[in-house]
Amino acid sequence: MLEAKDVNFAYLRGQPVINDMDCRIEDGEFVALLGHNGSGKTTLSRLFMALCHPRSGEVLVDGEDIIKREPADLADKIGYVFQNPDLQILEDTVFDEVAYGPRAKKLTEETIKRQVLEALDAMGLTELQKEYPRLLSFGQKRRLGVAAALALNPRTLILDEITNGQDALEKENMMSYLKAINEKRGITIILISHDMDIVRRYAKRAVVLHHGRKVFDGTPKEL
């Protein structure tokens, strides 16, 4: 469970970007964060990952102040996929890209192989595991980023504009895989998006931000 309680935040001496934020996300939810550029969506997700800390209020993970949690513990629980897939891609094979995180944790080779193959299968990339990422389509690179996060067995995935720049088929592929891991594996999905059609068809809940404030919290149908 992730929760922001009466959170306020501003970058350095700038204008506040999160104002009086109360937002609770339960385990296993599929939630979309909506809002125009600068509305606070990405900042809220960064607060949930302890990449920045509130000026006032609390951010909680499983009821505990996130500031008290060890970074490695948070990294195990929350995976983040950047808007630009090239930020997460090195020059190894697809398999090695996904194995990077588990290897950094010094897991056994047997465990690494199992977790990587499960992640590749979950995102429809098994047949591409020996390819090089630079040869993949943009949509495949995006799925590779998700697979790399999945290989660490997170409880929550935060996905920043995960369908941006993809054609209709790539969007459907991406969202069908995300729906499956949410429903079959119980992984919480937090989808940062501008795409109302995607949100309407896949998210179970929508949270709308405007100038750093929550202005709507309900089902996409209600929105």
Please annotate each region the language model reported:
Residues L34-H36:
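The feature captures the beta-strand-to-loop junction immediately N-terminal to the Walker
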Residues M49:
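Helix-to-loop junction immediately C-terminal to a conserved catalytic motif
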Residues G57-D65, L74:
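Conserved ABC transporter NBD signature motif
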Residues E110-L128:
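Conserved ABC ATPase "signature" region
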Residues Y132-L136:
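Conserved ABC ATPase signature
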Residues S193-H194:
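H-loop/switch region of ABC-family ATPase nucleotide-binding domains
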